[in-house]
Swiss-Prot record:
Function field: Usually encoded in the trnK tRNA gene intron. Probably assists in splicing its own and other chloroplast group II introns.
InterPro entries reported in the protein's UniProt record: Domain_X, Maturase_MatK, Maturase_MatK_N
Pfam families: Intron_maturas2, MatK_N
Record protein name field: Maturase K
One GO BP: RNA splicing
Family: Belongs to the intron maturase 2 family. MatK subfamily.
Organism: Erica tetralix
Cellular compartment(s): Plastid, Chloroplast
Length: 506
């Protein structure tokens, strides 16, 4: 454990200059102000004044700092909003802008860290990559030789102070942290910013960017234990260490593993039987070749580690141990499992020939049709058994808008599940959306689906649903064990930034 601490301190020593002066820079809040203006969540009040809002935000920042050093308890209470004219028209809008400004300022040291990592290295930069795309290499990797998997729900901090304390290792500017802490404690609804759920937690739409940044940084900190274990389990220390860092920081990972000619070799180093790891949002999958006893020790070790070193309350029931051979892996709407593929091998011995029955393991990824139909039913495209229905709330739109919305939803689903070899379930989803679109159009024109299709033809809908946009995508070639030729390429599109966005236009 002492060596693990030294590894952490070595990374944390790479700190940057003070960021406190940036809080007063006008261009920071101009950028944050522009981001908030693009949203309509806080701009419903008719009294909002665009010209004076940025000036009021700057005044508010100065006033907050003055009150902080005078130790005067002031900020955003319901009673004070009418007494103090500095708050202006919409205090929610100004607090949102301030939090956006915080997000811009605090992200600067980590952006500089990324640039220093990429400096002097030949990387193909792609700015449309998202962390959700990191699941593609995981689904392409053949992990059927592993025995057990840990299905982990990451514990969340019970107090925002824990998130702020984590930043101390990277931001050596104490004034910025004091100001951030002061603002968080005086903000009236900070307790409602974290919304607990049954299996995980999420942040409300208000100030989501800033709090997601704090949470993701906190998660990356206690993921560092896996970096340490990875360095201890490989003989190729430098390559293995860097490759595992790629799995944590997606921008570096995807550029190293996908866009270099040595992709296969680097991925092979990572697929060492000891550990296979992937995370997205609040869920972690940890696969290993170890026995059930070893995985159980892992389970209780992680619980103790999070509680003792990061003050995160976790329970063993949030970590499930499953055997990969008889358990399907449900991860981000991808249903993966290991199945036995029967094979017939012909053996020739002198004049006698024999047929030998055998089986090989294959890691398959399927489309979970039942949850998909449930999502479509919740969005009112079909009933609970998958029978298409019309979408009344869209009947007031133009015909082209209705068709485009349905086609957009299908393209999102199709691209998200594009890597599947068997697309039978996708055809069913297409049928539901296509017929729901036809019924919505027929409802608008006070007609029947049969009469509407005779008048315009269903070929019009088919054209919209099959029209593909020019989208950047990835392919992972697999080498044949006999001839070395490429086969079975699956396409993974990179235009997906959310999971099954069925209500994008709502």
């Amino acid at each position: 454990m002492e060596e693990f601490k030294r590894n952490l301190e070595l990374d944390r020593s790479q700190q940057y200059d003070f960021i406190y002066p940036l809080i007063f820079q006008e261009y920071i809040y101009a950028l944050a102000h522009d981001r908030v203006l693009k949203r309509s969540f806080f701009l419903e009040n008719a009294g909002y004044n665009d010209k004076s809002s940025l000036l009021i935000v700057k005044r508010l920042i100065t006033h907050l700092i003055t009150q902080m050093y005078q130790q005067n308890h002031f900020l955003f209470s319901v009673n004070d909003s009418k007494q103090n004219p500095i708050l202006g028209y919409n205090r929610n809008f100004y607090s949102q802008t301030i939090f956006e400004g915080f997000a811009v300022v605090v992200e600067i040291p980590f952006y500089l860290r990324l640039l220093s990592f990429l400096e002097g290295k030949e990387r193909v930069k792609s700015y449309n990559l998202r962390s959700i795309h990191s699941i593609f290499p995981f689904l392409e990797a053949q992990i059927f030789h592993l025995n057990n998997i840990l299905d982990i729900l990451i514990p969340h901090p019970i107090h925002l102070e824990i998130l702020v304390q984590t930043l101390r290792y990277w931001v050596k500017d104490a004034s910025s942290l004091h100001f951030l802490r002061f603002f968080l404690y005086k903000y009236p609804i900070w307790n409602s910013l974290i919304t607990p759920k049954k299996s995980s937690f999420s942040f409300s739409k208000r100030n989501q960017r800033f709090f997601l940044f704090l949470y993701n940084f906190h998660v990356s900190e206690y993921e560092s234990i896996f970096v340490f274990l990875r360095t201890q389990s490989s003989h190729l220390l430098s390559i293995s260490f860097e490759t595992f860092l790629e799995r944590i920081s997606f921008y570096k990972k995807i550029e190293l593993e996908v866009f270099t000619k040595s992709f296969k070799a680097i991925l092979w180093v990572f697929k060492e039987p000891f550990l296979h790891y992937v995370r997205y949002r609040g869920k972690v999958i940890l696969a290993s070749k170890g026995t059930s006893f070893l995985m159980n020790k892992w389970k209780y070790y992680l619980v103790s580690f999070w509680q003792c070193y990061f003050y995160i309350w976790s329970q063993p029931i949030r970590i499930h141990i499953n055997q990969l051979s008889n358990h399907s892996l449900d991860f981000l709407d991808y249903l993966s499992s290991v199945r036995l593929k029967p094979l017939m091998v012909r053996s020739q011995m002198i004049e006698n020939a024999f047929l030998i029955e055998t089986a090989s393991k294959k890691f398959d990824t399927l489309i979970p049709i039942t949850p998909m139909i449930g999502s479509l039913s919740k969005a009112q495209f079909c009933n609970v058994i998958g029978h298409p229905i019309s979408k009344p709330v869209w009947a007031a739109l133009s015909d082209s808008d209705i068709i485009e919305r349905f086609a957009h939803i299908y393209r999102n689903i199709s691209h998200y599940h594009s890597g599947y070899v068997k697309k039978k379930n996708l055809y069913r989803i297409k049928y539901i959306l296509r017929l729901s679109c036809a019924r919505t159009l027929a409802r608008k024109h006070k007609s029947t689906v049969r009469a509407f299709s005779k008048r315009l033809g269903m070929g019009l809908l088919e054209e919209f649903f099959t029209d593909e946009e020019q989208v950047f995508y990835l392919t992972f070639p697999k080498a044949s064990s006999t001839s070395g030729e490429l086969y079975g390429r699956r396409i993974w599109y990179l235009d997906i930034i959310c999971i099954n966005d069925l209500a994008n236009y709502e």
